[in-house]
Amino acid sequence: MFCFQCQETAKNTGCTVKGMCGKPEETANLQDLLIFVLRGIAIYGEKLKELGQPDRSNDDFVLQGLFATITNANWDDARFEAMISEGLARRDKLRNAFLAVYKAKNGKDFSEPLPEAATWTGDSTAFAEKAKSVGILATENEDVRSLRELLIIGLKGVAAYAEHAAVLGFRKTEIDEFMLEALASTTKDLSVDEMVALVMKAGGMAVTTMALLDEANTTTYGNPEITQVNIGVGKNPGILISGHDLKDMAELLKQTEGTGVDVYTHGEMLPANYYPAFKKYPHFVGNYGGSWWQQNPEFESFNGPILLTTNCLVPLKKENTYLDRLYTTGVVGYEGAKHIADRPAGGAKDFSALIAQAKKCPPPVEIETGSIVGGFAHHQVLALADKVVEAVKSGAIKRFVVMAGCDGRQKSRSYYTEVAENLPKDTVILTAGCAKYRYNKLNLGDIGGIPRVLDAGQCNDSYSLAVIALKLKEVFGLDDINDLPVSYDIAWYEQKAVAVLLALLFLGVKGIRLGPTLPAFLSPNVAKVLVENFNIKPIGTVQDDIAAMMAGK
């Protein structure tokens, strides 16, 4: 195996024996083969589009296939084998459609050479062996490999956001078309400039997709609003829901109503507490625990069923006993966990098994008490715009520091807690994603009633932070987003954070600090391009970085 898509990859070069995430070699290789098959689908999809006969029948499959390969999403080899088999069947159906259209248009059979991703075939007994030859290292040139993987890794993040929007009935053809264009491009001999242009286009598509998901979430569930979220527990048994899928959240709340079973969020589902549509449920108690990497002891002490709607799912440790109450749904898979099937057309997922099991479980063990505040997405912050602008003009707020992104296991991430603790009292932290758990329970106070930590929501709600920045640029009459009193100190872990990073670069943001390490998939030459064009920089010491940010550097 060779995998370097996450921040915790071995020695910051790549995992070759077993993933630092816990992913076995066999699973990693099957993920590579699935991407290979998706490239084959994309090749024929692109060719049909060129002939004026675009085929949209594989759009959902492509999104879900990319999403399933995100770090800590799917650990189930059988699920990957099934997706690969389905992908090959879909590709071959698409090939036949293309060959027929080509012959009808040109009066002759198609005879040009095609990449292997468009032609290889084999049954499940051949998957393991084939997977070894189609991975990342199949591309020999280091810089070409780096640019292709930067594109694919960013594409995985965009696909995750597009899939969430699609579940709510929101999609844009341009996003689905770009999925095919980007995947197919990685089978072509393109110039460096062409590949860089595609990476930047992925950043633009990340903005489009996050905007679409924002529209989907807020149209369906209302605009997030300032909310005090309980982090204690009640006396009833509960169900813990983690991940990002708000439709799963909505259906679970509805089905648990009146059952005597409470619902708690975990990890990236915390922002569900901010949406008006969910506040009407009195049995929605609050949030339990911290970010994804702390889940083993937290899932253990929760006592009730746990539902993983998306990443991040961490492998169970030997001492863990909660596998019999672990449920997955959507693209998530884990051998031994129960999987909740997709909703039928026009229907809802069936969570009755979780509810029945919850009724037999003791209530959650209390691990903390109190509350945290959030709900500062763009609609809410812009409603406070006059107050914020006045605070900036008066000097009460000297600087905003965007500390969005992911949390992770590495001890070096204490940097983000220390930055939050040591920033001057006239600064405000803007955050989204699970990076917030490094400082959202600190008592950092407020500035004239404006909390010093403004949590916009999930990682995709980094879009809100971009909207806020663009609005401030307009209010202050600035020509360049980089002239704002805003610094970016971003923590990354998985592929959605890469999509967010590309979105910020597309919007012209420069001087981003990215940590705790720069991505292993950036070759020295590609990293140099990002440094020279966008002034991306690694994190340094807490005091040096704070001093630089306060000086606008």
From Swiss-Prot:
GO terms for cellular component: cytoplasm. Its cofactor is [4Fe-4S] cluster; hybrid [4Fe-2O-2S] cluster. Signal peptide: none annotated. [4Fe-4S] cluster binds at C3, C6, C15, C21. Its EC number is 1.7.99.1. InterPro entries: HCP/CODH, Hydroxylam_reduct, Prismane-like_a/b-sand, Prismane-like_sf, Prismane_a-bundle. Its main location: cytoplasm. The keyword Metal-binding applies. The modification Cysteine persulfide is found at C406. The keyword rRNA-binding does not apply. Keywords: 4Fe-4S, Cytoplasm, Iron, Iron-sulfur, Metal-binding, Oxidoreductase. SUPFAM superfamilies: Prismane protein-like (SSF56821). One of its GO terms (molecular function) is 4 iron, 4 sulfur cluster binding. GO terms for biological process: response to hydrogen peroxide. It is found in: Cytoplasm. It catalyses: A + NH4(+) + H2O = hydroxylamine + AH2 + H(+). Binds 1 spin-admixed [4Fe-4S] cluster. Hybrid [4Fe-2O-2S] cluster binds at H244, E268, C312, C406, C434, C459, E494, K496. It comes from the Bacteria. Monomer. Belongs to the HCP family. Catalyzes the reduction of hydroxylamine to form NH(3) and H(2)O. This is Hydroxylamine reductase. It comes from Nitratidesulfovibrio vulgaris (strain ATCC 29579 / DSM 644 / CCUG 34227 / NCIMB 8303 / VKM B-1760 / Hildenborough) (Desulfovibrio vulgaris).
